[in-house]
Amino acid sequence: MSETPSTPPVPAGPEPGPVSRWLNQQGFEHQLLDPDHLGVEVIGVESMFLQVIVAALKADGFDYLQCQGGYDEGPGQQLVCFYHLVAMAEMVAKMGVGDSSSEAAKVREVRLKVFLSREDIPSLPSIYGLFRGADWQERETFDMFGINFEGHPHPKRLLMPEDWKGWPLRKDYVQPDFYEMQDAY
């Protein structure tokens, strides 16, 4: 009895979720990424399209910016900015109806990611005009990773002193040997 050699299955890419399908119907280009560990849809967008896509998602019911942040993929790799949007008004409306079924209780949420080169000064448009809650979150991301948010009304450090050199959460950050302490106010 001879067995025919089997070829290993080719791993399929992520399946487009409801938000990705909606963005495709609206004509928005985006990159489909693997969902997170909770099954939340994750979508990659180009920095120049960020404001337009966020505005479209807000018009489609994603009315709450749950969080915005950044991370460093490692030395020589990209910096990533992420935005987690939730359809909060829909969730509250479902709670008011009293429908406790698992499908009705499911919150519509999506995470957008923007991948940035660490060369020069990484920048992308601020979404402060769409979500006021982005104010301190974008400032913290600037402060820790050096990502500039164009159009932000308060583009200054949030946690570190204004004269601090470097971006402390970048993986290529070199910690200074000496800190000059200033007097308490």
Curated annotation (Swiss-Prot):
GO terms for biological process: photosynthesis, light reaction. InterPro entries: NADH_DH_suC, NADH_quin_OxRdtase_su_C/D-like, NADH_UbQ_OxRdtase_30kDa_su, NADH_UbQ_OxRdtase_CS. Its EC number is 7.1.1.-. It is found in: Cellular thylakoid membrane. It catalyses: a plastoquinone + NADH + (n+1) H(+)(in) = a plastoquinol + NAD(+) + n H(+)(out); a plastoquinone + NADPH + (n+1) H(+)(in) = a plastoquinol + NADP(+) + n H(+)(out). Its main location: membrane. It is a peripheral membrane protein. Gene3D superfamilies: NADH:ubiquinone oxidoreductase, 30kDa subunit. Keywords: Membrane, NAD, NADP, Plastoquinone, Quinone, Thylakoid, Translocase, Transport. It is an enzyme of class 7 (translocase). GO terms for cellular component: plasma membrane-derived thylakoid membrane. One of its GO terms (molecular function) is quinone binding. Pfam families: Complex1_30kDa. NDH-1 can be composed of about 15 different subunits; different subcomplexes with different compositions have been identified which probably have different functions. PANTHER family: NADH DEHYDROGENASE [UBIQUINONE] IRON-SULFUR PROTEIN 3, MITOCHONDRIAL, NADH DEHYDROGENASE UBIQUINONE IRON-SULFUR PROTEIN 3. NDH-1 shuttles electrons from an unknown electron donor, via FMN and iron-sulfur (Fe-S) centers, to quinones in the respiratory and/or the photosynthetic chain. The immediate electron acceptor for the enzyme in this species is believed to be plastoquinone. Couples the redox reaction to proton translocation, and thus conserves the redox energy in a proton gradient. Cyanobacterial NDH-1 also plays a role in inorganic carbon-concentration. Belongs to the complex I 30 kDa subunit family. This is NAD(P)H-quinone oxidoreductase subunit J. It comes from Prochlorococcus marinus (strain MIT 9313).
